[in-house]
């Protein structure tokens, strides 16, 4: 066998290509972790940071605005995750039933395109559609004799609209993964089930879903790891009229950190969010083992 040095010499081109990626990983993923230390300091730019222990966390937990943002984050993120997961599975099952390959490919492409759009573009599109003055939706409402609604400035409507927009943008990613998983389902079992008189719904419940359960659990856990990352979609759709409904941990951290210059407090809030994310992933992993007998992590 080749020695380590011989292997490195043989595959040096691959190592050279890997170096920029490794440096980016160090620069943008690992070095910023040292910023966690600011959570335990009273930090102001251009001045020495003073160690304050857990005071930032005590201040944070005593603020009503923090808990409001925290519970908003849980409600919005978990609801979005459930809708996105179920919607992706259902959509994948429906697309898998299409017999015309060209139509199936076109449908997959159309569904997947929004995933590549930035949230700024998505927000601009839906702001125009939902505009109370000349938006398409309000145009239909007023044409039918109703009053125009300022959807994005109405606390009653903001969350349903947010879920609709977020799912429209993200559902394609999960759908493509589940369609790929469905292509590996054993069709002989389905043929045997048809001979036994099983309906299409029964085949989906007892054959198809169990066959792709591993993929479903894996995608769910991966999404759970980033479930609290709501800054981009919330920030571009948020306004002062719906702050009580839409304020989440990341927007809260941004406002107190950047606008309020309370960097220690905002870092403490960010660290708290990271700990909750880790706990959610750990709980999801344990539930996965209990329900399916498999651990993702």
Question: Can you say where each PLM-predicted feature lies in the sequence?
Answer:
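A structural signal for multi-pass alpha-helical bundles of membrane permease subunits
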Residues: 7-297
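Membrane-interfacial, low-structure loops and terminal tails that flank and connect transmembrane helices
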Residues: 1-2
């Amino acid at each position: 066998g080749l020695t380590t040095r011989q292997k490195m010499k043989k595959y040096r081109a691959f190592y050279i290509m890997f170096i920029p990626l490794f440096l980016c990983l160090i620069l943008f993923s690992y070095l910023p972790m040292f910023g966690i230390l600011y959570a335990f300091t009273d930090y102001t730019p251009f001045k020495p940071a003073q160690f304050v222990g857990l005071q930032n966390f005590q201040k944070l937990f005593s603020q009503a605005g923090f808990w409001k943002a925290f519970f908003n984050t849980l409600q919005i993120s978990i609801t979005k995750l459930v809708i996105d997961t179920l919607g992706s599975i259902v959509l994948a099952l429906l697309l898998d039933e299409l017999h015309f390959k060209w139509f199936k490919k076109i449908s997959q492409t159309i569904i997947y395109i929004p995933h590549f759009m930035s949230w700024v573009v998505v927000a601009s599109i839906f702001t125009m559609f939902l505009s109370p003055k000349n938006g398409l939706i309000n145009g239909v409402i007023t044409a039918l004799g109703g009053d125009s609604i300022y959807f994005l400035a109405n606390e009653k409507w903001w969350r349903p609209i947010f879920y609709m927009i977020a799912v429209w943008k993200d559902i394609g990613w999960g759908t493509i993964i589940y369609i790929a998983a469905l292509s590996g389902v054993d069709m002989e079992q389905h043929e045997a089930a048809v001979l036994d008189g099983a309906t299409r719904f029964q085949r989906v419940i007892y054959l198809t879903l169990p066959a792709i359960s591993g993929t479903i659990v894996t995608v769910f856990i991966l999404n759970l790891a980033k479930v609290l990352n709501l800054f981009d979609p919330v920030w571009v759709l948020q306004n002062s009229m719906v702050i009580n409904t839409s304020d989440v941990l990341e927007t809260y951290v941004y406002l107190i950190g950047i606008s309020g210059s309370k960097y220690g407090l905002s870092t403490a809030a960010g660290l708290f969010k990271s700990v909750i994310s880790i706990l959610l992933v750990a709980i999801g992993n344990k539930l996965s083992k209990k329900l399916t007998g498999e651990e993702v992590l």
